[in-house]
């Protein structure tokens, strides 16, 4: 909800490409978070469908992030047709695998869990980990673009660097969730994006745009 609420603020950016990128990140992440929340609220077969739609929204966040990072750092990858077509092909291929999961079950399966509360637990399969690995690699490419920009900037970008670091915290929680039953095994990335968005849009907006 925080990401969706921040969209009007992002729409005020003058640079059209940066505006499209950050709005895309906020929209995709907001939908991702909403579907994740809905997954724990509803019950029955619809829960699996909601989780599936959330997965697609989450993967879409990666591509919106790359578009934003390319535009914000002054690169042109987001304008190149070959890059656009290749990105679309990869995205659609992964979406197809996710949509057909009810048939092959290689992306995830479900089971009833009772700890720390009763919910429909997700057991991730091989395809999930492959796509998750790809997502982390692509996200890291975007992070590299930002860190390189801030490193070469004449401005004091330390607060912005800290904000970027917030994006990595949920990854630590994701890993911890694999090792302890006290944490639900879901992707916590939307929390990091929400923290980053609040920081760049409401706390350090001028510095963010000045760089």
Model-derived features: where do they sit?
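First transmembrane helix
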Residues: 1-14, 23-27, 132-150, 196-204
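Interfacial "cap-and-anchor" motif at the non-cytosolic start of specific transmembrane alpha-helices
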Residues: 4-5, 33-34, 38, 147, ...
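Hydrophobic alpha-helical membrane-embedded or membrane-associated segments
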Residues: 24-28, 59-62, 136, 140, ...
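Transmembrane helix-loop junctions in multipass membrane proteins, especially transporters and channels
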Residues: 41-45, 73-76, 102-110, 150-157, ...
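Hydrophobic, aromatic-rich alpha-helical transmembrane segments
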Residues: 48, 52, 125-126, 156-160
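Extracellular-loop-to-transmembrane junctions of the mid-late helices
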Residues: 94-144, 176-186
